[in-house]
Every structure is written in C-alpha cells, then in structure tokens.
C-alpha cells in the first residue's frame, strides 16, 4: 500500500527530489511530511512544508492499495520512499503511461 500527498510547486527531481533527500531522508521524516496532507511546497520560505490545511483546506493523505494504483494517478513526477531512500518516477517521459525511474541529483538544495 502507498500513503501519499499532492505537492503543487516544482515537483521535478532537481528541486523536489533534492528537497526530499536532504530534509526528509528517513522513514520517520517522510511519514511526518506525508501526515500533514497535501501541500503547496515541501520546503518553503519558513524552512518547512507549507500545507493546505494551514489555510483551512481539508486535504488529508491519499491511500492506494498498490504501488501500481498510486503510479496510475497521472502526476508528472511521483516519489516513493523505500528502504533505500527516495525513488522518483517520471510519469510522462514517453507518453506511454509507463513510469520511468529517473535519478534524483545529489547534493543539498538551498531553498
């Protein structure tokens, strides 16, 4: 099963991927991030996630029974936290509806 949230801004690996691997690099931190629900950004002006719930919206995490169900939702990029860390899938690489695993660049991103 997969518990996930929607992230609005800059979901590409060069930004969000690096934010996730820098600031949410353990199962506990990833779970804490997801528990907040849908968000504008995982790392904003106040050096923390900016959740929709902070502006009064009710956007809890989404539950999918399988990884395939999660990956079929049509997002541009999808991220899964695994025992090896964050994995990124480009959902539209070849417009064939098949997720393509892409590399998350190394190095901290100052935001």
Predicted regions and their residues:
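Short, extreme N-terminal segment that most often corresponds to the first beta-strand
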Residues: 1-11
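Extracellular/luminal recognition modules and glycoprotein regions
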Residues: 11-20
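Low-complexity intrinsically disordered segments
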Residues: 21-111
């Amino acid at each position: 099963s997969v518990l996930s949230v929607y992230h609005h801004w800059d979901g590409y690996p060069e930004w969000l991927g690096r934010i996730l691997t820098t600031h949410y690099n353990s199962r506990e931190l990833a779970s804490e991030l997801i528990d907040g629900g849908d968000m504008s950004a995982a790392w904003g002006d106040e050096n923390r996630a900016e959740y929709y719930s902070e502006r009064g919206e009710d956007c809890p995490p989404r539950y999918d029974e399988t990884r395939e169900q999660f990956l079929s939702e049509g997002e541009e990029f999808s991220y899964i936290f695994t025992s090896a860390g964050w994995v990124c899938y480009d959902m539209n690489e070849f417009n064939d509806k098949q997720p393509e695993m892409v590399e998350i660049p190394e190095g901290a991103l100052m935001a």
